[in-house]
Structures are given as C-alpha cells and as structure tokens.
A protein has these predicted regions:
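Charged C-terminal helix
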Residues: 74, 257-286
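Positively charged, low-complexity intrinsically disordered leader regions
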Residues: 1-23
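Glycine-rich phosphate/diphosphate-binding loops and the adjacent beta-loop-alpha structural elements
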Residues: 31-34, 100-107, 237
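Glycine-rich phosphate/dinucleotide-binding loop and adjoining beta-alpha-beta core of small-molecule
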Residues: 2-7, 57-215, 282-286
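Short, small-residue alpha-helix embedded
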Residues: 167, 222-252
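Short pre-catalytic strand/loop immediately N-terminal to key active-site residues, enriched for Gly-Thr
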Residues: 212-224
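Substrate-binding N-lobe of the ribokinase-like
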Residues: 18-82
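Short, well-structured alpha-helical segments that form the helix of a local strand-helix-strand
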Residues: 180-189, 242-257, 270-278
Length: 286
C-alpha cells in the first residue's frame, strides 16, 4: 500500500492567510469544550486555533461561568458564546472542534454507557452532528470517548490517542508501521472518516490516501499535546481541506518539539508548543 510523506514541500500548499481581504477572510471557527474538571484543554485549543483564523468562538457547558473566567485569565483572543446560541455560531463557522475538556465519564467504556456527565456530552455532540452533518468537524477529547463511530458525521476528523482509538474502533493500533498504516486506511475508508494517529510516525488517512508525518521526540508524551493538534487542525481547516489540515497540524507540532528539544531537552510542555508553533510556521515563509 502506497504511503506519502508529509513535509515542508506539502506545507507550501497551505492556503491560510493567502486570500486576506475583510475582517473575516481568514475564516471563523467554533470550539466547544471545557468543564469544571478540564478547563486547560480548551485553552490550548483556543490559543492554537486563534492564531490561524479571523474569529474564534468558544462555547462551554451551560452554567459553568467560572470555566470561562478561568479561560479568559489565560487568553482573550476569543468570543464566548452562550450554549443557547451555539447553533448560530456553528452554522456560520468554516470549521468546528468539539470535545476538548468535555466530561467523558463511563460506566462501561466499549458500549458507551456513560454517567450523567458523559451522557450530557453525548447528547450535545449528537444534537450538533444531526443538525450540521456537512460541517467540517474535528472530533476529539470528551466527545470522541462518548459517541459511537457510527454517530460521527461522514468526512469528519478524529484524532484519537491509543486508548480512544480502541474505544472508537474496537481494535488496538497495530505496532508495525506498515500494518498500522493499512489499519488506519481501512478504518477511514470503512467509516468515511479522516483519522490522525499521534505516534512517533503519525498516520493520517481519509480512506483514499495515506500520509506519514515523521519527526518529533519523546517530549510529545506530555498531556495537552493532543489539544494543541486539535486546535491547529480546526484553525487550518478554516482555509484548507481537512486531510491537509491534520497533516499540517501534526507536522507543525513535531517541528516545534524538535526546536524546543534543541534548547531545553525534553523539559517542555503543551503551553511551550503553542508558543513555538508560530515560529515554526513563520520560518516556513509560506
């Protein structure tokens, strides 16, 4: 099975910031996430996405105003929207990320039986998927852990870690790279999704093509890295197709990790990645 390598040559195809005109010409995205337990995840996603688009809208769980205050303390480049208004903003957004920091408690993982908090996340996610099946979706975090693969809109991006991969697809990621590439390709084709794995060699496939993203280092095992990738993916998706966006997001994060490792070894975290990714992007002279 033929695989292709995503590198700087591919990055040069990026359409972000190529057609700048009015205030909204770089695109608009909505991010839905956050909870009393997980308010760091959406901050990382918001920071990553907001540097790539004209407008970033954020919706958090209804009634959890403290979540918004905590997030605003670390970031001001977004517009908070009330849960009752989320449909309107999803409708006008070019791409939507759902899941970072949403509650995902399970009673029974493989059959998606959830407690009250997980059930709320599931209800919200399914409602939006039903209303906006044609939207560019990036599905991650809490949502990815409480919905069945058949619930996810066709053409959507999923960015599972190894545990989430097994939960969603019912099988473990294979160890061998060639076997894993074929596995991801077949699952993407079967379910009509775009899958991005987060490995030493990350794999992205839409069931038609297989792209390999090499690089990075052991510093990427830190918590929050997936939220950075998800945020970059939705930001890039405002101006690019989804398969390119996830490949580019993975590439930028891996290159940022390499740059940080040169300066401080593996003593960096997801916050550091968010700050260094723009330097990597700028250095590409796109």
């Amino acid at each position: 099975m033929k695989t292709m390598k995503f590198d700087q040559v591919q990055m040069e195809k990026c359409k972000t910031f190529k057609s700048i005109g009015d205030k909204y010409s770089a695109g608009q995205v909505t991010i839905i996430g956050g909870s009393k337990l997980f308010h760091g995840a959406p901050i990382l996603a918001l920071k990553s996405a907001s540097r790539l688009v004209s407008m970033t809208y954020f919706s958090s769980p209804e009634g959890d105003k403290q979540i918004v205050e905590n997030i605003k303390a670390g970031l001001s480049s977004f517009v908070w929207i009330d849960r009752a208004e989320v449909d309107n903003y999803v409708r006008k957004s070019d791409a939507v990320l759902i899941g970072p920091g949403l509650m995902r408690s399970h009673i029974k993982e493989q059959n998606f039986v959830c407690d009250e908090h997980g059930a709320e996340t599931r209800k919200l996610s399914l409602d939006l998927f039903t209303k906006f099946p044609e939207k560019k979706w990036v599905v991650d975090g809490g949502t990815l852990q409480v919905v069945a693969v058949s619930d996810i809109p066709k053409g959507a991006v999923v960015t599972p870690n190894k545990k989430e991969f097994e939960m969603v697809f019912g099988e473990k990621l294979k160890d061998d790279l060639n076997a894993r590439s074929e596995q991801v390709f077949n699952l993407a084709k079967k379910h009509g999704l775009i899958i991005l794995t987060k490995d030493t060699v990350s794999i992205a496939s839409d069931g038609k093509e297989i792209w390999l993203v090499e690089g990075g280092n052991e510093g990427l095992v830190k918590g929050g890295v997936g939220d950075v990738i998800a945020g970059l993916s939705v930001g890039l998706a405002a101006s690019n197709d989804l398969l390119f966006s996830v490949c580019a997001a993975s590439y930028l994060v891996k290159k940022a990790a390499e740059k940080l490792a040169e300066e401080r070894g593996f003593m960096f975290n997801a916050d550091d990645l968010v700050d260094v990714v723009p330097e990597i992007y700028g250095g590409l002279k796109l």
